[in-house]
Amino acid sequence: MASQGTKRSYEQMETGGERQNATEIRASVGRMVGGIGRFYIQMCTELKLSDYEGRLIQNSITIERMVLSAFDERRNKYLEEHPSAGKDPKKTGGPIYRRRDGKWMRELTLYDKEEIRRIWRQANNGEDATAGLTHLMIWHSNLNDATYQRTRALVRTGMDPRMCSLMQGSTLPRRSGAAGAAVKGVGTIVMELIRMIKRGINDRNFWRGENGRRTRIAYERMCNILKGKFQTAAQRAIMDQVRESRNPGNAEIEDLIFLARSALILRGSVAHKSCLPACVYGLAVASGYDFEREGYSLVGIDPFRLLQNSQVFSLIRPNENPAHKSQLVWMACHSAAFEDLRVSSFIRGTRVVPRGQLSTRGVQIASNENMETMDSSTLELRSRYWAIRTRSGGNTNQQRASAGQISVQPTFSVQRNLPFERATIMAAFTGNTEGRTSDMRTEIIRMMESARPEDVSFQGRGVFELSDEKATNPIVPSFDMSNEGSYFFGDNAEEYDN
């Protein structure tokens, strides 16, 4: 965590390592994705999948979910203790799609969790390789971020649907560790904290006893993670207040919602990583690529390069647009659900449209959907340029207090202007500046009011040609000033339901 004074790169968090130099980081991240690839190849063999079936993203997701479920200690324990009808706690499985006589068939597969764990460990030199599991969780989370809207969840916790750009990682499981915490948006953590405080208000024993002590530690840890995402002293000071509160209640909820709103202009630092489906790593390993020897980074050219050379397929429903399905998966692969569409379009080399205009539903197929009419098509996941992923909120003034980009949480470190309507945002801050955090609130509002829309974020940063792996010649794009592109405008996506 940033506040503990140990700044580790997110590759280190992802691979659970202590401080390492760049080469060691690249090697350990390479070992992690190589392990995922080896596991995937072995699973395809077990399931007797053809080459084409193994490249189907829906099969990849089923296999990924099986291994995540096999290692979900908490849920496994819960299932053992609360046996439910028709669920074998020792087994895991899902839909596998096969091509038969020119048609796609769905087949439900079941495996012993023990067997899956054995295959996973074997692919990872006998280790549990938690980092690889977290990597898969982040890929699923990025896919959810691009596919679903969280309006209902926002409204339930008293937040505003306009804060959707703060919700990165909102579907990540609790057990996703430091790497998971790094990619969570400000709104996601605020929401977790508010849920906690609400439970404490409704349940007298929530903070009491031995369990309550553990709860309290978790609460303070989450507060520290959130504090570490804020870049201004006033925002951090309010987080200290929230963390030290003896008996967190409505005042703290108020403070947290205020902070979430302020993060629309004073953006927090949220990490972005390109996590790809397991089948992509599998394809590379199968073609003889040695990830550990070559090294790999989640935030540089490597994922772009991997996607340039991978052919992945997807099932397509009758009235879906394959190009739109490709856009959805491309955004998920680069963790770009919250990026400015102008920037994404430039990097991808084809226009990226807002979600409200996509003719495609989610990637996963529900068990009651008719397979008769299913077709499949190639996903176009290639890009025109590549760019470095960022973990800053894109605040302009030396990355400190200033205008970040509204309704956007930047993914790529690429210069852009900040077209935003400050009046709209400031309207959310009328009135309430009293209470014990009043001076900090006033300070935050003052900073937000002085934010200038003509400022530029990531000054001088550009994209790179795919041949420029050392990032020597940045190409700084120029964007149309007037329209900022949020992916969520005119949103009609489905809600995320567990």
Curated annotation (Swiss-Prot):
MF terms per GO, please?
A: RNA binding; structural molecule activity
What is the predominant subcellular site recorded for this chain? virion
Location within or outside the cell: Virion; Host nucleus
InterPro entries in the cross-refs: Flu_NP
Q: Which domain of life is it from?
A: Viruses
**Region spans: Disordered:** 1-21, 79-98
Locations of Basic and acidic residues compositional bias?
Answer: 79-91
Cellular component GO terms, alphabetically? helical viral capsid; host cell; host cell nucleus; ribonucleoprotein complex; viral nucleocapsid
Ordered alphabetically, the record's keywords are: Capsid protein, Helical capsid protein, Host nucleus, Host-virus interaction, Ribonucleoprotein, RNA-binding, Viral nucleoprotein, Viral penetration into host nucleus, Virion, Virus entry into host cell
Stored HAMAP family: INFV_NCAP
| Recorded family membership | Belongs to the influenza viruses nucleoprotein family.
Q: What does this protein do?
A: Encapsidates the negative strand viral RNA, protecting it from nucleases. The encapsidated genomic RNA is termed the ribonucleoprotein (RNP) and serves as template for transcription and replication. The RNP needs to be localized in the host nucleus to start an infectious cycle, but is too large to diffuse through the nuclear pore complex. NP comprises at least 2 nuclear localization signals that are responsible for the active RNP import into the nucleus through cellular importin alpha/beta pathway.
This protein's name: Nucleoprotein
Name of the encoding gene:
NP
